[in-house]
């Protein structure tokens, strides 16, 4: 009698990161899941254009292309470092840097990569903070066609 290998349901896991402690915790969970499922990770960091909607923001100088390149280079270095760490734990990992609204970009990447799961850290903001600042995790959970795992920061 031959034994059938267990099904691998989580082949591609997209992990959104803002490089926070909370995002690192979410990445650790994602690495563990991918490792146990024989899956792959795709890390995503989204850079946002400075908000110009408020008077204070409008008074600030808009970053020139040199500043944008510095932001991109710093983010690429962090993504590559985090991908190497996941690879050392035996999980094939790729990464991507995007510009735009984080929730929209993560949903777009998850669909394009045919992700089985999206993993995000969540900071547990108050209702007022969510109303004023929004919540990337909340928006992804609400709008994504792909299942989403949110990981809270350790208290």
Q: Where are the model-predicted features located?
A:
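Structural beta-alpha unit
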Residues: 1-9, 36, 81-118, 155
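Small/aliphatic-rich secondary-structure junction motif
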Residues: 3-62, 91
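General small-molecule cofactor/ligand-binding pocket signal
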Residues: 44, 94-98, 149
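Short, hinge-like loop/turn segments at secondary-structure boundaries
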Residues: 58-62, 112-114, 136-137
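A short acidic, glycine-rich active-site loop
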Residues: 62-77
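Glycine-rich, Arg-bearing micro-motifs that act as flexible, cationic patches
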Residues: 117-139, 153
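Short, flexible loop segments at boundaries between secondary-structure elements
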Residues: 148-154
């Amino acid at each position: 009698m031959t034994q059938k290998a267990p099904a691998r349901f989580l082949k591609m896991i997209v992990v959104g990161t803002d490089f926070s402690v909370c995002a690192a915790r979410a990445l650790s969970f994602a690495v563990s899941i991918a490792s146990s499922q024989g899956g792959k990770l795709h890390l995503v960091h989204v850079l946002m254009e400075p908000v110009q909607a408020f008077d204070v923001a409008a008074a600030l100088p808009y970053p020139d292309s040199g500043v944008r390149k510095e932001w991109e280079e710093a983010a690429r270095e962090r993504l590559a470092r985090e991908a190497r760490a996941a690879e050392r734990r035996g999980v094939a990992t790729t990464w991507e840097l995007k510009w735009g609204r984080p929730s929209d970009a993560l949903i777009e990447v998850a669909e394009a990569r045919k992700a089985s799961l999206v993993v995000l850290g969540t900071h547990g903001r108050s209702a007022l903070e969510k109303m004023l600042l929004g919540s990337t995790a909340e928006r992804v959970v609400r709008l994504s066609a792909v299942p989403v795992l949110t990981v809270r920061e350790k208290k």
